[in-house]
């Protein structure tokens, strides 16, 4: 049994198909990606809307312009990683990034724009302008969009103030 702080209600563990531990960007997105027919318990150690993801000011790197390429993004990432990167993981992340950006926009994330196109910046070890932002609050914008969708899903119960 689980009793979130400030609640008299107990939550039985055996009612859940999936338990997601952590409600930062990864936990929120994982919860949203699960099929609607599954009952999901999302456990969050924080009682307020706080997470490391929310404080992230950096942007999201993605190949979205014709003068860029997956190969160049992979090369930049591996160079910056100085031998610490898992090549297969880097390849997957780089190739999936444009789809993730599209998905985030469908969910309601509004990236900075220059006229009618997504605005990109040149940062860190990137050799092309490929970093997308929401002002200097990209992490906050990301988490807020994901939280809004999690809270609207009837199959997801988001419990705050739970230590696992």
Regions found by a protein language model. Name each.
Residues 1, 37-40, 117, 141:
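Acidic/proline-rich low-complexity IDRs
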Residues 1-5, 21-25, 73-74, 119:
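A broad, low-specificity signal for short, low-complexity segments enriched in glycine/proline
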Residues 1-18, 36-38:
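Extreme N-terminal leader/targeting segments of oxidoreductases
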Residues 8-10, 45-164:
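Conserved N-terminal/central alpha/beta ligand/cofactor-binding core
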Residues 18-42:
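N-terminal Rossmann-like FAD-binding beta1-loop-alpha1 element of flavoenzymes
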């Amino acid at each position: 049994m689980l009793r979130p702080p400030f609640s008299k209600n107990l939550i039985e563990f055996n009612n859940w198909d999936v338990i997601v531990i952590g409600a930062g960007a990864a936990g929120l997105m994982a919860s949203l990606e699960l099929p609607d027919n599954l009952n999901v318990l999302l456990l969050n150690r924080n009682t307020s809307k706080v997470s490391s993801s929310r404080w992230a000011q950096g942007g999201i790197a993605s190949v979205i312009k014709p003068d860029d390429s997956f190969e160049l993004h992979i090369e930049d990432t591996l160079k910056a990683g100085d031998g610490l990167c898992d090549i297969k993981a880097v390849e997957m992340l780089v190739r999936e990034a444009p789809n993730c950006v599209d998905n985030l926009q469908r969910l309601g994330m509004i990236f900075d724009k220059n006229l009618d196109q997504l605005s990109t910046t040149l940062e860190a070890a990137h050799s092309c302008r490929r970093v997308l932002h929401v002002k200097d609050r990209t992490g906050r914008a990301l988490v807020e969009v994901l939280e809004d969708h999690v809270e609207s899903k009837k199959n997801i119960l988001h419990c705050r103030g739970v230590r696992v």
